[in-house]
Amino acid sequence: GDFITAEIAAGRTVNVNLKNLAVGYKNSSFDNGVMIHEYGHGISNRLTSQGYSCLTNLEQMGEGWSDFFSLMLTNTPGYTATTARGIGTYSTNTATTAGGIRQYRYTTDMSVNPHTYADTNTTGGQPHAVGEIWATMLWDLHWKMAEKYGYNYDITANANSGSAKTLQLVT
């Protein structure tokens, strides 16, 4: 901090590199899902009025919305309701079929992701755990809407698809 500030004040060029040589380290900025997740926080903070503290308490929904945005904006052709999807798999140096940074992968298959609303009673108010449950419910909603109105991995291609309608409802 002080050294860099002094160098800048002296008019010298400062090059800063962030490195972590730990085994398995991957730069999270190359993980589309993580980047969209973080951008999702910006969306939910912008759309939620100030003064309610619903995005800063232990029962916040922001983590779930952010995971949901990540899932929606990284869909690909061929995904189905039972395709199991992780969050942060690149960053954790795990296979795309792994859970990544969440306890369970997102899917409507209850044998893979057994989360239900009742699980919020046992999270201890941990925001990521509550968010994972909320995102699971939103993901289930997406696939029910896709079942009724059609799935489209490109949400901009058809505003009447269940995928686009779900994203519109959530935002």
Which residues does each predicted region cover?
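Extracellular protease catalytic domains of secreted zymogens
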Residues: 1-171
